[in-house]
Amino acid sequence: MNEETAKEWLKKAERDLKAADVLLREGIYDYSLFHSQQAVEKYLKAFLTYHNKHFGKTHNIPLLIDLCQSI
């Protein structure tokens, strides 16, 4: 378990989620969607990191989901 690195991923994901919320309220939908996607990716990476599951350098959310399901 790599708890500290997982916590770092969670902090980054939370910042992206907050940014997405602010942008959504301002009607800036494309950037809100971008930060939402970034948050999802980072939450998945936090989970994988916590469970010591290697994911390499990727932005492939379906792959990350598959890796999470394999745990």
Q: Across the structure, where does each feature detected by a protein language model lie?
A:
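Terminal alpha-helical segments
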Residues: 1-71
